[in-house]
């Protein structure tokens, strides 16, 4: 029998030197242990860059627009600014007539299509005249003066159709009376219109409201559908008329 010696590479003391060489050990690729990773997309950095570029462009455009608007406003000289402000105030400033006059809605404004073009604002057109129902209290003389300042006169009723129109307006304000352009110089004297023409009781009658001892009821107002004489210094509303 032959013995095969398996003792190799003995050192000086007789110990066997073990060879742990890793030449025969084959390591698996790292990718096989953890699994292969998908390569990253080459378009991702490009998309991110384009997004940042667009954002920068929008910001720059907004800043330039704001600077341009500021420069345009600051470039206007003081005189132009003052003129602009003054024109704006004039456009929004209410007129004297709009402050003094108040006009109630009426049937005539509905039947005639509102305030007609030939008449001024707050005036109502009927026939060949414009009428203003003034709701600022005044005496007969003060009302006459007020209508004259507007280029008109106190109401003069020429016929029954005109009286029906006026009655349709005043009937909706039965608690109020309106001065008209009819007066007389003395008690029991004849009535005259403001233009000096005589009054003829064809369309209406003037009812007497004065006691026997009073001599001051020398002016006329219309109250609802009735016409009365009254003291001229009494404060009341009025009706102005202007022919077209």
From Swiss-Prot:
Basic and acidic residues: compositionally biased ranges: 24-33, 77-104
Spans annotated as Disordered: 21-41, 71-113
PROSITE patterns from the UniProt entry: C_TYPE_LECTIN_2 (PS50041)
Gene name, Swiss-Prot/TrEMBL: Clec7a
Observed phenotype of the null mutant: Mice were born at the normal Mendelian ratio without obvious anatomical defects but are susceptible to infection with C.albicans. They show impaired myeloid cell activation by fungal particles. Deficient leukocytes display impaired responses to fungi, characterized by reduced inflammatory cell recruitment after fungal infection, resulting in substantially increased fungal burdens and enhanced fungal dissemination.
Keyword Transferase listed: no
Annotated protein name in UniProt: C-type lectin domain family 7 member A
Motif extent (ITAM-like): 15-18
PANTHER family tied to this protein: C-TYPE LECTIN DOMAIN FAMILY 7 MEMBER A (PTHR47218:SF1)
Superkingdom in the source lineage: Eukaryota
Effect of residue 232 to A: Abolishes cell surface expression
Quaternary assembly: Homodimer. Interacts with SYK; participates in leukocyte activation in presence of fungal pathogens. Interacts with CD37; this interaction controls CLEC7A-mediated IL-6 production.
Expression across tissues: Detected in spleen (at protein level). Highly expressed in dendritic cells, spleen and thymus. Detected in epidermal Langerhans cells. Detected in macrophages, liver and lung.
GO annotation (BP), single: cell-cell adhesion
Domain C-type lectin: start-end pairs: 126-241
Stored InterPro entries: C-type_lectin-like, C-type_lectin-like/link_sf, CLEC7A, CTDL_fold, NKR-like_CTLD
Record membrane topology: Single-pass type II membrane protein
PTM comment, free text: N-glycosylated. Phosphorylated on tyrosine residues in response to beta-glucan binding.
Annotated source species: Mus musculus (Mouse)
Locations listed in the record: Cell membrane
Its biological purpose: Lectin that functions as a pattern recognizing receptor (PRR) specific for beta-1,3-linked and beta-1,6-linked glucans, which constitute cell wall constituents from pathogenic bacteria and fungi.
Residues spanning the membrane: 50-70
Keywords: Cell membrane, Disulfide bond, Glycoprotein, Immunity, Inflammatory response, Innate immunity, Lectin, Membrane, Metal-binding, Phosphoprotein, Receptor, Signal-anchor, Transmembrane, Transmembrane helix
Topological domain spans for side Cytoplasmic: 1-49
């Amino acid at each position: 029998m032959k013995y095969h010696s398996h003792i190799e590479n003995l050192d000086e003391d007789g110990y066997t030197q073990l060879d742990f060489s890793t030449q025969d050990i084959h390591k698996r690729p790292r990718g096989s242990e953890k699994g292969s990773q998908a390569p990253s997309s080459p378009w991702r950095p490009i998309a991110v860059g384009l997004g940042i570029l667009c954002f920068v462009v929008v910001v720059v455009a907004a800043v330039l627009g704001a600077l341009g608007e500021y420069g345009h406003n600051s470039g206007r000289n003081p005189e132009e600014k003052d003129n602009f402000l003054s024109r704006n105030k004039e456009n929004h400033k209410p007129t004297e007539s709009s402050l003094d006059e108040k006009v109630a809605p009426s049937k005539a404004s509905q039947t005639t299509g509102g305030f007609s073009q030939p008449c001024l604002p707050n005036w109502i057109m009927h026939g060949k005249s414009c009428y203003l129902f003034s709701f600022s209290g005044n005496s007969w003389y003060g009302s006459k003066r007020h209508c004259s300042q507007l280029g008109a006169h106190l109401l003069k009723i020429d016929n029954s159709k005109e009286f029906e129109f006026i009655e349709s307006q005043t009937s909706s304000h039965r608690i109020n009376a309106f001065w008209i352009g009819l007066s007389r110089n003395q008690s029991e004297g004849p009535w005259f219109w403001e233009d000096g023409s005589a009054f003829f009781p064809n369309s209406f009658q003037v009812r007497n409201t004065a006691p026997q001892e009073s001599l001051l009821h020398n002016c006329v107002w219309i109250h609802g559908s009735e016409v009365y004489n009254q003291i001229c210094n009494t404060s009341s509303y009025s009706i102005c008329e202007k022919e077209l």
